[in-house]
């Protein structure tokens, strides 16, 4: 399992622990990932994605999972999220016809 958000693309960063004496040791800054089940109003399906905690509030602010994923850029989304986005677009166009 990669340590990367499926909706925002936020991954692991590398840096230093710096002590009081300015001694530097390497460390990893890992994202706060959570496995969350999102429900789509358009497809009426549930999708489990691994997202960071900040992304959860961003999804709520955007007006729900469907609105967020339709606004999201494709090169930031994971392959799983891109297939979900395609399903949402297909069912949205089928319902509008």
Curated annotation (Swiss-Prot):
GO biological process assignments = translation
**How is this protein annotated for GO cellular component?**
ribonucleoprotein complex; ribosome
A GO MF label: structural constituent of ribosome
Alphabetically ordered keywords of this record: Ribonucleoprotein, Ribosomal protein
Q: List the disulfide bonds.
A: none
Q: Which family does it belong to?
A: Belongs to the bacterial ribosomal protein bL28 family.
HAMAP family found in the cross-reference section:
Ribosomal_bL28
Record's NCBIfam families? L28
UniProt-recorded name of the protein: Large ribosomal subunit protein bL28
Q: From which organism does this entry originate? A: Rickettsia felis (strain ATCC VR-1525 / URRWXCal2)
Report which gene this protein is encoded by.
Answer: rpmB
């Amino acid at each position: 399992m990669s340590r990367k958000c499926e909706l925002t693309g936020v991954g692991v960063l590398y840096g230093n622990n710096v002590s009081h004496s300015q001694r530097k040791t390497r460390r990893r800054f890992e994202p706060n990932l959570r496995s969350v089940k999102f429900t789509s109003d358009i497809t009426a399906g549930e999708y489990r994605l691994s997202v960071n905690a900040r992304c959860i509030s961003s999804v709520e602010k955007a007006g729900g999972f469907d609105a967020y994923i339709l606004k999201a850029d494709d090169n930031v989304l994971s392959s799983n999220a891109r297939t979900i986005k395609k399903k949402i677009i297909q069912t949205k166009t089928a319902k509008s016809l």
